[in-house]
Design a protein with these regions (language model features):
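Short cysteine-rich clusters marking metal-coordination/redox-active sites
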Residues: 1-9, 18-21
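Flanking scaffold residues of small Cys/His-coordinated metal-binding clusters
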Residues: 13
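Active-site-facing substrate-recognition patch
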Residues: 17-83, 91-96, 100, 107, ...
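Short, well-ordered alpha-helices that flank and scaffold nucleotide-derived cofactor binding pockets
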Residues: 107-111, 167-174
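Metal-dependent phosphoesterase core characteristic of DEDDh/y 3'-5' exonuclease domains
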Residues: 113-116
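Residue-level marker for buried hydrophobic side chains located in beta-strands
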Residues: 153-155
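Cofactor-binding loop segments of dinucleotide-utilizing enzymes, especially the Rossmann-like FAD-
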Residues: 158, 180-183
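Acidic, divalent-metal-coordinating active-site segment for phosphoryl/phosphodiester hydrolysis
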Residues: 159-169
Length: 195
């Protein structure tokens, strides 16, 4: 059977993800109302995505930047209508990695991705407690000399774990809508009433 599958893959010149791997992406495709702002969630965050994000971001496997959105190229048409603004890594993390993961991921949709935020302190959110994460508004700042195009604003991020970063950014930039690649199952569960 695997020989047949491999033979079929031979005919897909632009295939970035094999059909077996593609099945591991747990589609969620849900819209949440967060204080009157729509938040679009593409995937449910799970162990597969956790490993993939780690390999991409921390092991600097930059070729993976295209796999997250390659099967959702219909988003290009939608994203082009907006000024796409992403959340940022800390300066230290950006220097260590040598790239800005969210910018590169969303740039795969052929849109220019703005980076109007900065982190006042270097805080690793994945190891922070929920109460520390809720204080992200004290850590996130908006660049003063960073003019944005006169378009509707789409705020994007890679993962929504508790939603604290998105809420802090929302207060600073007042987006028309928000989009994340993946949301943590606990966040999804806690926000069922916001669908």
């Amino acid at each position: 059977m695997s020989e047949i599958r491999n033979f079929e893959i031979f005919f897909y010149n632009d295939l970035l993800i094999c059909p077996d791997c593609s099945k591991n992406f747990k589609l969620h495709k849900q819209v949440y109302n967060i204080d009157g702002i729509p938040l679009y969630v593409l995937y449910e965050y799970d162990e597969f995505l956790e490993r993939l994000f780690f390999q991409y971001k921390e092991q600097r496997d930059v070729v993976l930047k295209d796999v997250f959105l390659c099967e959702h190229l219909y988003l290009k048409k939608i994203f082009k209508k907006y000024c796409v603004c992403t959340l940022c890594s800390s300066d230290a993390k950006r220097m260590e990695r040598g790239f800005e993961p969210a910018i590169d991921m969303y740039s795969s949709l052929d849109v220019f991705v703005q980076s109007p935020f900065y982190k006042k302190k270097d805080i690793k959110q994945s190891s922070a407690t929920k109460s520390k994460r809720s204080q992200i508004n004290n850590v996130l700042g908006l660049k003063q000399l960073y003019p944005l195009p006169k378009k509707k604003i789409l705020l994007v991020d890679d993962v929504c774990t508790t939603g604290s970063t998105l809420l802090a950014a929302k207060q600073l930039i007042h987006p028309d809508c928000m989009f994340v690649l993946a949301a943590h199952p606990l966040w999804i569960l806690a926000n069922q009433e916001n669908i």
